[in-house]
Amino acid sequence: MKKLYETTIVVDGGLDESVIAATVEKVTGLITSLGCEVKTVLDVGRKNLAYPIGKATIGYYVHIEFESDGTALKELERQYRLNESIIRFLTIILDKRLLEMRERVLKYGAPPQTSEDNSSEGEEFVEEKKSSE
């Protein structure tokens, strides 16, 4: 039975754009060559790392969703370790609850604002009321 997985890779952000693009292409090609089906590829882009990893202080983040029966994960993560452009990676199973939550967000949009978010608007209204007296 195939499950839905998400892998996040962090490529060294100090590399040239063409090297980063080639690394992402190589990873997606590797996933398909291992018998998995790539669903989505999301390039998040460059972000400052919370702490240096080796000499890298900037990382290029990529999220890839794919379906697999789980047999390819060991080889996939071995290839991540061998690729010097990839400085970090994480692969997780997307469970049913997370997928349902994503569908709800897509269907209904962003969650409603809380009362804390609207507190500044209420203060402005009170100030306007006082000035009109």
Swiss-Prot record:
Family annotation (InterPro entries): Ribosomal_bS6 (IPR000529), Ribosomal_bS6_sf (IPR035980), Ribosomal_S6_plastid/chlpt (IPR020814), Transl_elong_EF1B/ribsomal_bS6 (IPR014717)
Ranges where the record places region Disordered: 109-133
Listed GO CC annotations: cytoplasm; ribonucleoprotein complex; ribosome
CDD domains on file: bS6 (cd00473)
GO molecular function, one term: structural constituent of ribosome
Domain of life the protein comes from: Bacteria
Family matches, as Pfam families: Ribosomal_S6
Keywords: Ribonucleoprotein, Ribosomal protein, RNA-binding, rRNA-binding
GO biological process: translation
Family to which the UniProt record says this protein belongs: Belongs to the bacterial ribosomal protein bS6 family.
NCBIfam families, alphabetized: S6
Main function: Binds together with bS18 to 16S ribosomal RNA.
The protein, known as: Small ribosomal subunit protein bS6
UniProt organism field: Chloroherpeton thalassium (strain ATCC 35110 / GB-78)
Gene name in the database record: rpsF
